[in-house]
Amino acid sequence: MFEFVCQQECAHTQARAGLFHTPHGTVATPRFMPVGTLANVKTLTPEHLKAAGAQMILANTYHLHLQPGEDIVAAAGGLHCFMGWSGPILTDSGGFQVFSLSEMRQISDQGVVFRSPHDGQIIELSPEGAIAIQEALGADVIMAFDECPPYPASREAVIQATQRTLQWLERCIVAKQRSDQALFAIVQGGVYADLRRECAEAMVPYDLPGYAIGGVSVGEPNRIMHEIVAVTAPLLPVHKPRYLMGVGTHLEMLRAIAAGVDLFDCVIPTRLARHGCAIVQGQRWNLKNARFRRDYEPLDPTCPCYTCRTFSRAYLSHLVRAKELLAYTLLSIHNVTELIRFTQAARQAILEERFAAFAAEWEQRLVVDAEEPDAALL
């Protein structure tokens, strides 16, 4: 039911191209996955996502538990029916949101107690509860409940969080009942390479369908994040998909792909769109800038998305300045397409045994051009 097939490995890096088979379709890796927090990728329909090349998307356990509630989703036939998406879906366990968003939380070995930001209700979330919610939601891939330590955090605090994550993984495995869902473990360990290694080595014997690297991109310097990913990814089974959570910029994905990572997710394409920004060839363009007001070129002439085929930079700039809702949809279409196309290009380069050259070219390109003050590196 779930199988990862490695099609090609890079001779010079750890990069690999593969196929991840799920009950709702196959995901060609490396692949960027759009984030649909509340069972929708903001401003986009399933048809938009398909046209952008999306194969698997995410939904958020924490937020869906709070609203509308997993019982309502289950009564609709699960997430696929509820949101009208026929492809694979991944749900996170809610751990990251509990630890990063919730106030007045209390953490113990049993789980987490926190106050709902919607109505102030006290909510308890345990490993067993996280699995039960995800089974009701019905995604293809579900994530183990973990404790995500903040950055910075003391070594002692990270040790405790890592040990608790391992204990909670065991409970998630015992609690899981549905055979049509793949449970992924999440490797923690903060910025400490030895703790990452210990956590990964403790998780691998469970022989789960996939493994994720969590607790990165939480405020640590990019250099440290890349080092942690480079250390952790090779420790994970070669015949299972590797998922880097919450990462989705060009440079981050490029280096993670070179380290052997297969799957990525991030809210950045739609979040930037809602702020009037486009991602173009790895750079961030603020379309409120005056230089776009009379620029009648496509946003990116090389991009095949609906936005780039149909509208000019000047028109998009006008929509952004006027705060027209259409701007957010059109920019989201392009930004999601841009990140998916980038991972598709990396995959093709791996298959054609030219990834090392591809990576070197993009490494050189992904530098802020001093002559382009409106461009920011992504």
UniProtKB/Swiss-Prot annotation:
Q: EC number(s) of the enzyme?
A: 2.4.2.29
Pathway given for this chain reads: tRNA modification; tRNA-queuosine biosynthesis
Q: Name one GO cellular component term.
A: cytosol
For this UniProt entry, the molecular function terms from Gene Ontology, in alphabetical order, are: metal ion binding; tRNA-guanosine(34) queuine transglycosylase activity
Biological-process GO terms, alphabetical: queuosine biosynthetic process; tRNA wobble guanine modification; tRNA-guanine transglycosylation
Q: Please give the residue ranges the record annotates as the region RNA binding.
A: 246-252, 270-274
- At which positions is Zn(2+) bound? C303, C305, C308, H334
Cell division as UniProt keyword: no
**So what does this thing catalyse?**
7-aminomethyl-7-carbaguanine + guanosine(34) in tRNA = 7-aminomethyl-7-carbaguanosine(34) in tRNA + guanine
InterPro entries, from UniProt? ArchSynthase1/Queuine_TRR, TGT, TGT-like_sf, tRNA_ribo_trans-like
Its biological purpose is as follows: Catalyzes the base-exchange of a guanine (G) residue with the queuine precursor 7-aminomethyl-7-deazaguanine (PreQ1) at position 34 (anticodon wobble position) in tRNAs with GU(N) anticodons (tRNA-Asp, -Asn, -His and -Tyr). Catalysis occurs through a double-displacement mechanism. The nucleophile active site attacks the C1' of nucleotide 34 to detach the guanine base from the RNA, forming a covalent enzyme-RNA intermediate. The proton acceptor active site deprotonates the incoming PreQ1, allowing a nucleophilic attack on the C1' of the ribose to form the product.
Subunit structure, per the record? Homodimer. Within each dimer, one monomer is responsible for RNA recognition and catalysis, while the other monomer binds to the replacement base PreQ1.
Name the family the entry cites.
Belongs to the queuine tRNA-ribosyltransferase family.
What is the name attached to this protein's record? Answer: Queuine tRNA-ribosyltransferase
> What organism does the UniProt record list as the source?
Thermosynechococcus vestitus (strain NIES-2133 / IAM M-273 / BP-1)
Q: What high-level taxonomic lineage is stated for the organism?
A: Bacteria, Bacillati, Cyanobacteriota, Cyanophyceae, Acaryochloridales
What gene, per UniProt, encodes this protein? tgt
